[in-house]
């Protein structure tokens, strides 16, 4: 069991946060305690494509963009961290979108 946990810490973590107005996704390197990249509905490339920033379409676009950016950084495998949110609705849409664009978790 301990070895499994250590293996997970060698991978990057995709953290998802939802507020009332925006969708956020970060890829975090826990070994070095730093955020590698961050994408949200406030990111200009994402915001320009949306009229509403807190729906499933916004979550899908954030998932797509975070996956593309991660692949540009050479990150393919991540651990999905949804916090206390249920794997439902916007969280599920973001995860499926990131998977469809090449992230593995």
From Swiss-Prot:
InterPro entries listed in its UniProt record: Ribosomal_uL18_bac-type, Ribosomal_uL18_bac/euk
SUPFAM superfamilies noted in UniProt: Translational machinery components
MF annotations from Gene Ontology: 5S rRNA binding; structural constituent of ribosome
GO CC annotation terms, alphabetical: chloroplast; cytosolic large ribosomal subunit
Coiled coil, from the record: none
UniProt record, GO biological process: translation
UniProt KW keywords: Chloroplast, Plastid, Ribonucleoprotein, Ribosomal protein, RNA-binding, rRNA-binding
PANTHER family for the chain: 39S RIBOSOMAL PROTEIN L18, MITOCHONDRIAL, LARGE RIBOSOMAL SUBUNIT PROTEIN UL18M
Protein purpose: Binds 5S rRNA, forms part of the central protuberance of the 50S subunit.
NCBIfam families: L18_bact
Family membership noted in the UniProt record: Belongs to the universal ribosomal protein uL18 family.
Protein name per UniProt: Large ribosomal subunit protein uL18c
Organism: Cyanidium caldarium (Red alga)
Taxonomic path: Eukaryota, Rhodophyta, Bangiophyceae, Cyanidiales, Cyanidiaceae
